[in-house]
């Protein structure tokens, strides 16, 4: 059963396997980017081109190299460097975070677990490799005052900022993820009952989920729909004005950083912080609502770990 060993070929086979499993494009993109980077590093740094020559020691050398070289100092393809000019980035060669390195290791582990299950390799080099340890930090969140400051500085006469304003309010009010919010279409939203159906194909857990929003958010959504329909004819709830396609996560994240800077707020706050805020408000809503909140929290937030609850209750200094 031990067949073709070239790493490049095996990555192609693995990606084909991922497509047959109907994994999300984002997941497959993460796998391929990580694996192509690792494949080129093995080939250029160690002259290794086959998966059977990858050992535990090779993996550990790769980890050490990641820790030493810094961000964007190695790339999967020459075209990537020529197109993106990583050396012009402000964070060029800054340390790669432990979280990022661990994500790389998880993706590499998935490949070698698959190779082992397919009997392409006899020994799995990732079997004894552990994720790097790092100190978990309390989740970032915005206070009510900071939230008001953030949205008050947004220009709602300008299409992109009006769209982003409504997205921020909606995520803050419902606890939905950015990727879920950006993928919404008109039929997902029921304004009369003030609820949104998050379809299985856009949720992280691949299960339908319903979230509810307030009367104030309903008013904001109705105004947005009137505004949007004057400029774009699309079924997407939060489109890009020119194309009518849904705003990308990357686009929104870049805009969000700009809004934080404009409001002189913590630059480390991310859009996911709005989801943290939602969970924190649920947890702090009073002991009398305990059973209701637990059911709502599990249903809406779908958190897989109670560790979030502990971290989100940590007061800010």
Q: What do the PLM-derived regions correspond to, one by one?
A:
Residues 12-29, 35-138, 153-157:
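N-terminal core-binding DNA-recognition domain of tyrosine recombinases/integrases
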Residues 214-266:
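Active-site/catalytic core of tyrosine-dependent DNA strand-transfer enzymes
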Residues 119, 170-183, 285-287, 296-299:
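A short, glycine-centered helix-capping/turn motif at helix boundaries
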Residues 28, 108, 167-168, 175, ...:
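Alpha-helix N-cap/helix-start motif at helix boundaries, enriched for small hydrophobics
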Residues 155-159, 233, 253-294, 301, ...:
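Short, basic (Lys/Arg/His-rich) helix/loop patches that form interaction surfaces
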